Amino acid sequence: MNAFGLDFETTKVSRHPKTQFREVGDEMFLVHPDGEQIHNLNPMAAALWRLMEEPITGQDMADIVQAAFPIMARTKVESDINQVLSQLLNLGFVETSAK
């Protein structure tokens, strides 16, 4: 378990099926399933959102991000992913399931 309560290696994360993704120019937004919240995604969150098209573990996300940006320290990659996933989970934009 990490500091956010996710098992990085075994918990799969996926998009909530009713969450809507919108791109407006260079900006990316999520519209909450209840339609009452809109959140702007930073580039890292948008990239992770795209990776969650199918259920995926944080570990698998970190492997992909690390391969794309090998200069980044692995601990920083994992920390950033954990933070984004925690926020998206707490806001109800994504769901978790066991591997």
Question: Which residue stretches match the model-derived regions?
Answer:
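Long, low-complexity, charged/polar intrinsically disordered regions in eukaryotic proteins
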Residues: 1-34
